[in-house]
Amino acid sequence: METIKRHLDLRPILKAKSCFLLGPRQTGKTSLLEAQLPDATRIDLLDDEIFLRLQAKPTMLRDYIKHSGQVVVIDEIQRVPPLLNEVHRLIESDKSIRFVLTGSSARKLRKKGVNLLGGRARSRRLHPFVWAELQGSKIGFDLPRSLLYGSIPSIVYSDAPRDDLKSYVGDYLKEEIAMEAATRNLPAFSRFLETAAHCNGQILNFQKIGNDAQVKRSTAQNYFELLRDTLLGSDLPAYKKTRSRKATTTSKFYFFDLGVVQYLRGVRDLAKGTPLFGEAFEAYIHHELASWCDYHSDHELSYWRSQDGRHEVDFIINGDVAIECKSTHAVDAGDIKGLNAFALETTLRHRIIVCFEPRPRRVSGIEILPWAHFLEKLWSGDLIR
């Protein structure tokens, strides 16, 4: 099986500091580290013997340190948060040692009193595959498949993606949530997940979601926080720095992978031209943009909507690049209204419509780009530097 080269490269980071590498299960953290750091010492906290030993006596971590300049990978660091105190001590005693601390959940790491190394480690998040990684591989990039089955590496490689998505969601419910001891009511959480999937890319109405999932409003809020903590979803903040029109201030919520969303929704087919296809296309572009922003420092992703709801722009990068997604082969005047309205509120370097037109063109200062052309410009660095 081909090992697909990942865009995220930890080696430049490790020249300066240690690193947290966070990401949901099966996003490829282990494969990335094996490819980039083949000589690193690996400590797997999913190994019960190692887990019990280091949980009982975190100072035994020093037994794994053999020489200066060593790189030590600790997998699933959230299982033994007190181990971070020993990591801190070892970094202080030998400035040449580097740790890579992986985690599939940030929940226990965010608790009060957990040592996050006080700036001695940078943090990176690994996403499922992106266009630039698949396009350059033997597998290649298949947009319809990505919209339906997502980009989790094990699903991309799979000959039975829907069956494997079923297993993935089941494993998440049984293992990740149970391991975190985050909720004891798995049937209610399962109902909530299905309801939440229908809210992907939307502003959340906790009362309605709670009613649909047959849980309290406060429980729905807590469950969304659990999704964030276990890296299964994240917020897209609203852009608020407008000149005249008041803007919506509430975030939208996105799951980390579109295949998980489609499985939870029960979607088995996506027909072009349908609202469902349009939603999926927009969510996929969000995946690409969120991944790009996380892999490159100092970039902010948001969306803009006027408070009266009349105008909206799907994505804003750094406040000066506005991007609209349209699953159409022919962009018309109605498709550019949101970009034009937003241009009156701030100074923009780029206004872009990502669509299915056959070739790039420009209309009234707006770049109309075929989706593949847009992604090539994004990942090559031609769009944002």
Tell what function each PLM region has.
Residues 21:
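Hydrophobic anchor at the beta1->P-loop junction of P-loop NTPases
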Residues 138, 358-385:
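Domain-level recognition of nuclease-like catalytic cores that cleave nucleotide substrates
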Residues 84-107, 115:
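Conserved catalytic/switch belt of AAA+ P-loop NTPases
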Residues 107-122, 139:
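Short regulatory helix/loop adjacent to the ATP-binding pocket of P-loop NTPases
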